[in-house]
A protein has these predicted regions:
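Surface-exposed, charged/polar loop-rich segments
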Residues: 1-65, 76, 145-148
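Extended, C-terminal/distal alpha-helical "rod" segments
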Residues: 63-176
Length: 176
């Protein structure tokens, strides 16, 4: 139970983000409003995340958002989330500490030979995740972080499951 309680905030943000995206995407008028305020794809992974946030905020504070009365309670909830600095702070935090994991997966999932780099990349990824979590929590490297412990255990379990002798051999034979 301890593991899930540490990760619950991630699921809550994911559920809210999915609800916001679906609310806008599944209502023609709301989608039209979003497209009016932004020429970006809604909530797609991009370096233009900030522009999407600004567009969403402009959309929900516009007169058109207030005038359109379909599903007013959900619209109000969406507006509160989009204007919430706390919610966006959680989104940014999750993106910061999962970014090294995402980058590692993206790099390893290419046609570029990288087997010889996996050990060092994995260690580097874990250190970057730790750095982001500890920075956010205001902890020193020698202190204990419940969230980091849970994520570390997940990453190590994944490494143990996927690690094979070829990684070790490739790492050993890599000329530096």
């Amino acid at each position: 139970m301890h593991v899930w309680s540490q990760l619950e905030f991630i699921n809550n943000v994911k559920v809210e983000a999915t609800m916001i995206k679906n609310f806008i995407m599944n209502h023609g008028m709301r989608l039209s409003m979003f497209n009016e305020f932004s020429h970006l794809k809604l909530l797609s992974i991009a370096e233009t995340r900030f522009a999407s946030v600004v567009s969403l905020q402009h959309m929900v504070i516009s007169d058109k958002w207030s005038i359109y009365k379909e599903d007013a309670s959900t619209a109000q909830h969406v507006k509160e989330k989009i204007l919430s600095d706390v919610w966006w702070g959680n989104v940014e935090y999750i993106l910061r500490f999962t970014s090294p994991i995402y980058d590692m997966i993206r790099f390893a999932d290419t046609d570029t030979p990288c087997l010889h780099l996996i050990y060092e990349m994995w260690d580097s990824m874990i250190e970057k995740v730790k750095k982001e979590i500890y920075l956010h929590e205001g902890k020193e490297p020698n202190e204990e972080s419940d969230l980091y412990s849970v994520i570390y255990d997940i990453l190590i379990a994944r490494w143990t499951k996927g690690n094979n002798p070829f990684h070790c051999l490739a790492h050993s034979l890599n000329p530096r």
